[in-house]
UniProtKB/Swiss-Prot annotation:
Name listed for the protein in its UniProt record: Protein SlyX
Gene name, Swiss-Prot/TrEMBL: slyX
Region annotation (Disordered) ranges: 52-72
Record NCBIfam families: PRK02793.1
Bias (Polar residues): 55-65
Xref: Gene3D superfamilies: 1.20.5.300
Family designation: Belongs to the SlyX family.
Amino acid sequence: MQDLSLETRLAELESRLAFQEITIEELNVTVTAHEMEMAKLRDHLRLLTEKLKASQPSNIASQAEETPPPHY
């Protein structure tokens, strides 16, 4: 009776381990895909930011364009 219980418990543990290994592999694939997508989105955001900066003139005048401050 004791041997059957040990065999049953061992089979259950092996089954759980196999399920966990499959789950870990699936999660690894998902995380890798998300990392790749985030890298693409970061690149896209950087390009859009550069385009936006290039298309909008700055409201701050350069130092050469500024009028000199009054002297006291």
